[in-house]
Each structure stands twice: as structure tokens, then as C-alpha cells.
Amino acid sequence: MWKHVKQVDPEIYEVLVNELKRQEYGLELIASENFASLAVIETMGSMLTNKYAEGYPQKRYYGGCEWVDRAEELAIERAKRLFGAKFANVQPHSGSQANMAVYLALAQPGDTIMGMSLSHGGHLTHGAPVNFSGKIFKVVPYGVNLETETIDYDEVRRLALEHKPKIIVAGGSAYARIIDFKRFREIADEVGAYLMVDMAHFAGLVAAGIHPNPLEYAHVVTSTTHKTLRGPRGGLILTNDPDIAKAVDKTIFPGIQGGPLMHVIAAKAVCFKEAMTEEFKEYQKQVVKNAKKMAEEFQKRGYRIVSGGTDTHLFLVDLTPKDITGKAAEKALESCGITVNKNTIPNEKRSPFVASGIRIGTPAVTTRGMKEEEMEEIAEMIDLVLSNVTDENGTVKPEVREEVSKRVRELCERFPLYRDKIEGVEI
């Protein structure tokens, strides 16, 4: 593997090998990360990257598209079958571009959109002021009830009635509960808005049938194809409305993108095929079991979990009672081979660059084959680290760092990731 890279560019080869080692021997708990199969990785690294294919299958602006047409057609048909959609666009380069395409297809610059506040669990592209969505459109953010820390649907309705948005966005990047899509659609219909659901985080759960399918209520659904779907980095747009599908297609190309990434689209097709298996369904069930178990273990150790738990693949830990910042916790854990990300919590008092919480997700460790027993062990190790942080920079007592680093390595060796499947690389 990578023998040609080693010959041509030793510096990048070093990057590849060291990143492989980091993934192989570290505990990945960032909720938006996962480990793609070698089938997906091989497809992304194929000669399909050489092919320009502006347009759509059978309607290209270039010749020689016979086989990339086939790849995209497979991706489209599999996406439609997987999620029960009548129309699918597999060309978005990312979830952000999928969201941008929907906004520009259904609204005009200056129109009002509603999305969950970033500080309450939303995403940058749902209207954050620093993002294109917050610059192009008038944004009315909604949030969670500060008592229950779940979406305040009455407040969503009140804001919608007051501001009459063109689009209401449901979904988030740090929201652990199942969203009431039916309630959102009722609110959207009441004010004549489109309902767009961004299911980037929980698409894998939807594909496995263990999470409500937003297509039952949404006018249009966007997603990424990595995260819980465990595919290549990319975007996806689904709808059952032919007019919306036509508008979205025109907005993706020629609106905001040129040539599609055919090597990634083919890898999406592989990902969708993998997601149709019974093995994938069992995997997703275990992802949720693991998240629930780990959240419970944190609660046993005196940590406060935002909203009291989780229904999905992730949860937020409020570190305020432990007198440690999210930034310090992230640094401390990383020094021991455990990766999480600092995250704001509802009613946050600190800067998002410091934050009062950490976000934890179980998709990646579950891909390795870990189950509830390992979640208990991981929670115990995290608690040990966070109980021995000596300063605001996340410095951990040396003896604790050494102990936990050793335990992390041993745990990862019990659940190999890629090292028993690839040849020619010593890790």
C-alpha cells in the first residue's frame, strides 16, 4: 500500500503512515468521524479521479462518460432505495454544499430561514453569522428549552408565525435526541415554509431503520455520506418532490459546482450498498447501545449529560461541575490517545473556542467491534484523565497519562482497525 507515494513523496508517505498509526492505536470518539471500509477507500483512490463529467448521467458536457455514468446511476438508485426517496442528487462535494444548494434552490438572498442556534446544537450552515447561510439570508435561530435541553417546539412555532420564514431547517451537529419531524412539518405548513431536514449526523441510523426517516415529513433532506453512514466525505440531497428535485439539480450544476468528483460518487455507491446489509443494521443498533451505555457510565461518575441522555450516536458532557473547560479536556484526552471535541452547551457562558462541554460519539469505536463492556472501560479512563488535569492547558499528571495511554493502546490492539487488512506498511 502506498508504495508509489513512498517513492515519489516520502514526506506525504510519512503523513499517511503516521495518520494510520494514530487511527489504529487511538480511541476515536469525535461524533462526526468514522472509519470507511477498504472498499470505499480503494474506490476513492481509483482512476475515476481522472474523469471530468460536468452535467448528469446521459447529459454530460464531455465525452467518454459511459462508465462514470454507470457509477453515478448506481449511487443514485441505491440512495433512493436506501432512504425511500423518489429523487437523489449525489453530486454535492460536502454537506455544506448540499445545504447551500437547497437554500439557493428554494429561497432568494435576503429571504428568512430558521435553523437551530449553533450554541444549542445546530450547525454552521443553519444560519451562523460567520457562515454563508448567515450572510446571504436573514436568519431567525431557535433553540432548546433550558430546563429540558430539548427543542422548544412551541418557541419554534411562535418564531415561525412571527417571522414567516421561507425555509425551516431541522437537524444539528450536537443534538442527542430524536427530532419530532411531524411537529416541524405542521409548523412549516402553518406558515407556508419548506421543511428541510439535515440528517448528516444520523443518516446511518435512518438507513438502518432505527431512527425515524425525515423524508416522511420533510420537503427535502440533506446529508453527508461519512459520519454514521461510514462512506466517503461528501454530500447527498433527497426529495420526493419533482419540482424541488429539478431546482436542486440546476442549483448544484451549473449553479454552485462544476465537475463532480466521480471517484467519490462511486465510493458513495459502495457505501450505500454496504448500508443495505444486515451487518450494517446491527452495527447501527450497537452504535446507539454504546452511546447510551457510555452516557450512563458518565452519569454514574457524577457528570451531567445534556438533556439527561441520548437517543442517538452522540451525547454532550457538561464539564462545569468538574471545574474544567472543554478545551482543557480535549487537550488532556488527546495526550492520552483519546480524541473528542470541545463543544458549547445550552446557555453557554464561555467562548466556543474554550467551551464548557465535550461532545462524544460512538460510531468509530463501534466500527472496531467494541460493545457495552468497552464503553464502561472508556468512560472510566476518561474520568481518570479528567480527574487528574493540573492546569487550564489540559496537562495531565505524568503517571496517569502513562497509565491511560498504555491502556488505550492495549484496548485498540484487541480491536484492530486496518492493520490486519493492509500489506506493505509497518505500523
UniProtKB/Swiss-Prot annotation:
It is an enzyme of class 2 (transferase). The keyword RNA-binding does not apply. PROSITE patterns: SHMT (PS00096). GO terms for molecular function: glycine hydroxymethyltransferase activity; pyridoxal phosphate binding. GO terms for cellular component: cytosol. InterPro entries: PyrdxlP-dep_Trfase, PyrdxlP-dep_Trfase_major, PyrdxlP-dep_Trfase_small, Ser_HO-MeTrfase, Ser_HO-MeTrfase-like, Ser_HO-MeTrfase_PLP_BS, SHMT-like_dom. This is Serine hydroxymethyltransferase. It comes from Thermotoga petrophila (strain ATCC BAA-488 / DSM 13995 / JCM 10881 / RKU-1).
